[in-house]
A protein has these predicted regions:
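Short alpha-helical segments that sit at the start of domains
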Residues: 83-114
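Short, amphipathic alpha-helical interaction segments positioned at domain boundaries
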Residues: 168-197
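Short, cationic-aromatic polyanion-contact patches
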Residues: 106-107, 154-178
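Phosphate/pyrophosphate-binding active-site loops
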Residues: 1-89
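Basic amphipathic alpha-helical segments that dock to polyanions
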Residues: 117, 139-149, 164
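Short acidic, hydrophobic short linear motifs in intrinsically disordered regions
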Residues: 114, 119-132
């Protein structure tokens, strides 16, 4: 309720010449943190439901009827939480999928890198060597092994200073609000040039 009322007041004041919507939406996760809750990204829900958001905001600002904006924010929190849960479930299942796909030796640098790719889906060999506390050569070899297995893709085309991406993680994190995570995973696999899991 506080988030909805504060947001509608902020939008009514319109303190900046540009960016009020972005700043107003940025205040929500800060309010969540201040109240002791984990922050939740709800802008995706707003973008998908822009007309309802506008109507609810106008009712609060012009008629002082806050019920619509409170209901909208509640719906946004519930839907965004469910969307985040789906994203988390899809991401946390990836290391097992990758292990099956690559048949990596247990505790090898390649196997250990799988967990790091969830946390850092775009990385260099230097970053991986730091994270795993292995030599640059061991990290480079691990990334080559992961690339052959269809876990990562090298993005630069360079011979040196190469950047690797776990495209399935990137696709999941970049997917439109509400999209089935499996559709995003298929897109990531397509970028990797592989079929299925």
């Amino acid at each position: 309720v506080r988030m909805a009322v504060a947001h509608s007041h902020f939008e009514a004041v319109h303190p900046f010449s540009d960016g009020n919507g972005r700043v107003g939406r940025m205040l929500w996760p800060l309010q969540m943190l201040a109240a002791g809750h984990l922050p939740l990204y709800i802008s995706g829900y707003i973008e998908e439901n822009a007309a309802a958001y506008s109507q609810a905001l106008q009712a609060a600002q012009k008629q002082l009827d806050y019920s619509a904006i409170v209901a909208f924010v509640c719906d946004a929190v519930i839907a965004s939480s469910a969307d985040e849960d789906a994203t988390k479930a899809a991401i946390t299942s990836l290391p097992d999928t990758w292990r099956h796909r690559g048949a990596f030796r247990r505790k090898s640098s390649s196997d250990r890198a799988l967990g790091e790719l969830i946390r850092l889906p775009i990385m260099t060999a230097r970053q991986l060597s730091t994270e795993l506390r292995v030599s640059f050569q061991a990290a480079s070899t691990a990334l080559k092994s992961l690339e052959r297995a269809g876990v990562v893709r090298e993005r630069t085309g360079y011979g040196r200073n190469r950047i690797f991406a776990a495209e399935e993680v990137v696709a999941l994190l970049s997917r439109p609000f509400g999209q089935d995570p499996e559709i995003a995973l298929e897109g990531g696999r397509e970028v990797l040039g592989i079929d299925g899991a």
